[in-house]
Design a protein with these regions (language model features):
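Conserved ABC ATPase "signature" region
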Residues: 128-146
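Conserved ABC ATPase signature
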Residues: 149-154
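Helix-to-loop junction immediately C-terminal to a conserved catalytic motif
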Residues: 64
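Conserved ABC transporter NBD signature motif
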Residues: 72-80, 89
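The feature captures the beta-strand-to-loop junction immediately N-terminal to the Walker
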Residues: 49-51
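Conserved structural motif at the start of ABC-family nucleotide-binding domains
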Residues: 17, 32-35
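Conserved beta1/A-loop at the N-terminus of ABC ATPase nucleotide-binding domains
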Residues: 17-28, 74
Length: 157
């Protein structure tokens, strides 16, 4: 979700993530992703659907520069993510991967608040307004009812 309400209130610009002709292979022979293109603009909700092992996580990692595309590029507001310094990149986007063991004790709301980390800072304290904004995101996604449910109690799919 490229949700811009929180960003605007923190003085951070909302961003557009674009992938053009993304291709990826772990071993150079077996293609995992082929010719993937999309544009996610601020305020849009983008769903990536696929079977287990189909490359959804790989797509996200390539999209934000955690893995390098074998072919194609990812752009954040028109700039190749591989040419953006890490500090600047992570001040504009958040990536919260699925990791049930890591999030076992956290609620869904807690995990959404983790995405606010670059604005709050490592030693910063979550404010009431942060919680309200996170709940607003969950409400927008129509999953506010899961806010206080433990992530370990949710389905991985």
């Amino acid at each position: 979700v490229l949700y811009n309400s929180y960003a605007k209130n923190r003085g951070v610009a909302a961003v557009t993530l674009t992938v053009e002709n993304g291709c990826f292979s772990y071993d150079g022979r077996h293609t995992v992703l082929s010719d993937i293109s999309f544009c996610a603009s601020p305020g849009e909700i983008v769903a990536i659907l696929g079977k287990n092992g189909s490359g959804k996580t790989t797509l996200l990692k390539c999209s934000v520069g955690l893995l390098k595309w074998s072919g194609g590029h990812s752009f954040l507001d028109g700039r190749d993510v591989l040419h953006i310094k890490s500090r600047e990149l992570w001040s504009k986007i958040s990536y919260v991967p699925q990791a049930k063991s890591s999030f076992g004790g956290y609620t869904v709301l807690d995990s959404v608040l983790l995405g606010f980390g670059s604005s709050i800072g490592i030693f910063g304290k979550t404010q009431k307004s942060d919680v309200e904004k996170a709940l607003s995101v969950l409400r927008r996604l129509n999953i506010e009812n899961l806010s206080y449910k433990k992530c370990s109690d949710l389905s991985g799919g």
